[in-house]
């Protein structure tokens, strides 16, 4: 950002390792972080999510990408959306298709996710922060997102009780966008 001449940015980490990376940016560059938004995140992986990530990698290695894609897609989307969109979600251009034929990349992603640990450093985040908790998220469940909110001074939390890991459906996406845009507007200026 320095090379681009950008002084402050909104760090919007939506689902997964991107949200974790933005925790690191907010910690190491408080001058750069105007705000931070985290969804589908964690401060430190617990045993269950570690086993889940390792299982996905093992399935990818042993059974192939298609089996991995089916497994993670069923866990990532709510049942109605999955049933209505299965043909789009699974296949060559479906969910997580960037990992097709990329077991090495999947391995690095898993290692990065498992080594992420900001729990004792979140207290140093100064940027206004919004952490969203999705009640039906079976991947990064609220047991993982709550410690992020609780350990960042002044962080705001927002619960989407009926949202899965990936927020889908018109009403849920509108709700998500309204919460996100209202938070960013409140802290712009």
Segments from the language model and where they lie:
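Conserved acidic catalytic loop of the alpha/beta-hydrolase fold
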Residues: 1-9
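Glycine-rich nucleophile elbow surrounding the catalytic serine of serine-hydrolase chemistry
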Residues: 14-24
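Flexible "cap/lid" loop of the alpha/beta hydrolase fold
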Residues: 23-28, 33-63
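Conserved alpha/beta-hydrolase catalytic His-Asp/Glu region
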Residues: 47-49, 66-121
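Short beta-strand/loop motif that positions the catalytic acidic residue
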Residues: 125, 131-133
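Short alpha-helix in the alpha/beta-hydrolase fold that links the catalytic acid
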Residues: 127, 141-148
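Acidic catalytic loop of the alpha/beta-hydrolase fold
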Residues: 136-140
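Catalytic active-site module of serine/aspartate enzymes centered on a nucleophile-bearing elbow/loop
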Residues: 155-189
